[in-house]
Every structure is written in C-alpha cells, then in structure tokens.
Amino acid sequence: MNHTSDTALLIVNLGTPEAPTAAAVRRYLGEFLSDRRVVSIPPLFWKPLLHMVILPIRGPRSASKYAKVWLQEGSPLSVYTRRIAEGLTQHLPDWRVAWAMRYGAPALTKALDALQAQQVRRIVILPLYPQYSTTTTASVQDVVEAWCKRTPQVQVECIQDYAEDPAWVAAVAASIRRHWQAHGRSEKLMFSFHGLPQRVANNGDPYPQRCQVSASLIAAALNLNESEWVLGYQSRFGTERWLQPYAEPTLWALAESGIRRFDLVCPGFSVDCLETLEEVALGFSETLAARGATMRYIPCLNDDPAHVQALAGLAQRALL
C-alpha cells in the first residue's frame, strides 16, 4: 500500500509533569489519578481524598524524586518519546508522525485535532505499552473512541499491544546481550513490570498473562533456563493487594538465599521514566546494597534504532 501524507502514526505514552516541581507534579497526578480506569473508587469519596490528602503529600514528595532523574532537555519519558517519534519519521517517510501523552502535555485529543487539521484521513494509534491493560491501553482507547465519534471521517486503527512481537522481543533481548557483553552476566536476571491491583486481574484484565508471555519469550531468545530469571511487579500504590511476586521483596529474598549479583530490566516500559530510573535503578540498588548484593539496571529500549524499527513495523502492519 502506498502511504501518503494522509496517513499518520500517533504514538502515545502515559505522561509526565512539565517540571520537577510540587505544583507541576500535583497537576499531573491530579489528572492521572482522576481517571476511573486508574482509580475506580467512586468520585464522591475519591476526589476529596485525592485533593485534600494525597496530592498535598505526594506532590512535594514525588517532585523531589523527579528532580533526581530530570534531564537537561526535560522529563526522561517526554524526551525519549519525542526521540522515538523523530526516529519513526525516518522509517515512515510517507507518514506523518506525532506523539502525545494520555495525561499532561502534549495532550492526546489536541494531537488528534492537529492531525485532522493537516487533512489526515487515516491514523494508527500506537500506545507505548507493550502489554495490554485496561488501566493503560484501554484508557487511551477511551479517549480515541470519544474523539472518533465526533470525527467519523477519519479512519483510526489502534494497536492493542505488542507483548509478543518478534522484532520487539529481539530488540529487548539484544539490549540485554549488549549489557552482558559490556559488564558480564549476573547470577540472576529479573524482569520487573509495573504492577496493578490484584482485583483488576481478577476482573479479567489480561495484563499479568501478557507480562508472563513477554518475559518468557525474551528469556527464550536469550537461551535462559527457568533458574536464571525471575519475574516481579513493582510500583505498588496504596494498601490493597497487587500482582505478585513483588519485585523488591523478591530480590531481597534471593539475596538472603545467597545470590549476590542481579541484573534487572523493565520490559513493560518503552522508555525510561521515574519508575525505572528512581524507583528501580536507584532505589532497588540501594536496598540490595544494604543486604550485601549488587544490582545493575539495564535501560529501557528508549530510542534504540531496533526499537524504533520494531514500532514502525507494527504501524505498517496495522493498515494491511
């Protein structure tokens, strides 16, 4: 199919504060935690708790964490997402390529409006969540579907996920191999994925199965046996039970069993962000060091050329 400028690819990531300040973080978290896909507590109870308790506490606390990982160009998540979009223009020369965030800026709806204003007739939406979840991908789809209802003349295709896409799996495996070639192999590799409440999975969210599929395929590409890798879930929020095993306590238990050297990669994150750089690369490393063990963080694919090429392939196949 010969794609011209009436075809566009819109990559969508989660979002980020515009600055590592308490005010900016509060604005961002206020939008993020108001999404019923993310927090399903009835608004009558949740909104007062969010605005009177959670945001005043988490705003300053999270701002200090963002400051630790903020780049000169801006938020890592924003910087790398933009670089991916720039790279995609090289692989898709006959497409328009844009990027947006589900929360914060550049806003998803505004990005869609801008593409329509450029006379785009077909848009492929690619949420940068390798593993589908109702809490992430479906939230993007909600916004896109609402926009499509008032813009029926534009054909929109939304990619569900790419948890087992061969090119993506190969790119992740290659990044791990490069790390091993440069630094040597550890005793255990952990695949750490963002967690979500267990009740969400109990209600039918396929996310844990998609994470398991991704981890198993990457491990197979690396010729690892089951004793050489482990899966865990990070970034738990609140007091309810989340997906298990929890990543950090699992590492602690393994360290106490005698394992002293770990590598950790986060295949559920397309680009590095607060959760990978501050929580994992800094936080997990510190707590393991206190237990006499070391952990080396393997960065996300970010704007790795193999990652960009894999995403371009997903977009092209979406219109076949």
Curated annotation (Swiss-Prot):
It is an enzyme of class 4 (lyase). The keyword Hydrolase does not apply. SUPFAM superfamilies: Chelatase. PROSITE patterns: FERROCHELATASE. Pathway: Porphyrin-containing compound metabolism; protoheme biosynthesis; protoheme from protoporphyrin-IX: step 1/1. InterPro entries: Ferrochelatase, Ferrochelatase_AS, Ferrochelatase_C, Ferrochelatase_N. Fe cation binds at residues 194, 275. GO terms for cellular component: cytoplasm. It comes from the Bacteria. Its EC number is 4.98.1.1. PANTHER family: FERROCHELATASE (PTHR11108), FERROCHELATASE, MITOCHONDRIAL (PTHR11108:SF1). This is Ferrochelatase. The gene is hemH.
